[in-house]
């Protein structure tokens, strides 16, 4: 989809250009295919309602362990997905189809995408036309894998960079005429902190060019690994699964000055024990901010001289990492300390999870028939 075609179609009525007559109705879909969690959307909410119709599903497929007895798994299923897989993980071999936002297991990805389609189109009586978010600088191999998997499930596919879709999802079209409204699509710098990567994107009203995009392989998963290492260094007798480490991070994450008083219960040789992890959580999360700030400087330096000062006033943090306490304030403080003039860093929304899918659905509703990959 070209820059011009996206701009032209997004601002049109949802009907767009007349599509060829088909026996099936069209079902536009927006999909955020995440490393840990995905969101699929078939209906837009009323602007400003604060609600969304997205279906959130953990990105995981479960295969039964060899020799599993009948009646152990629901419906004696040969494969489970999402929450069903996690609820029965004791009896399953869990496979995450994606790593760092890129498909690693093509068959698991196809199965998972098929499961997502069933959630919004269980009878498959419609032509499902799906726009899917991709990492900011996904290479050709990553795009080809995703396209192959998606085309095996959906009737039409479009792949669009995730930060652009997040900006579009955040945009409130009803407020565009308000003088104080900062349009996230007009001139902004989006920072999308995911599990596998952190993506940066300059958005200036059109489809981003390659030079407007940057992606680093550092996100929530790296924070988990660092936190695990720090806990092991301080408590050698403690051996925790990464899922438990991730749970501590998600509950207690913060950046800035070290905090104490974060005590958690862990098993040591089967016995309960409480340990203090406040300093370790802060150090792990601050490492993420170090990486983000260094990359932000690189992206800001690439912005055009006529746009950079207003761009600095519209830096938006989204993705799972946006839930880290004080992350927007800490990044803004570091930019000020480095000499940037009046930067303004803010969080996208209280609930970031549907933004990419909302933006994807807006594109899907506006796309012309000849723009879909079949």
Language-model features and meaning:
Residues 1-53, 64-67, 84-190, 203-287, ...:
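Nucleotide/phosphate-binding catalytic cleft detector across ATP-hydrolyzing
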Residues 58, 359:
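Short hydrophobic/aromatic beta-strand or adjacent loop that forms the aromatic wall/cage
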Residues 59-64, 70:
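N-terminal low-complexity or amphipathic/hydrophobic leaders
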Residues 68-83:
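N-terminal structural subdomain of ketosynthase/condensing enzymes
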Residues 193-195:
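C-terminal, charged low-complexity interaction regions
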Residues 199-201:
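A structural feature that tracks compact, well-ordered secondary-structure segments
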Residues 294:
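Periplasmic peptidoglycan-binding/anchoring modules of Gram-negative envelope and division proteins
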Residues 354-356:
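Repeat-based blade/solenoid architectures
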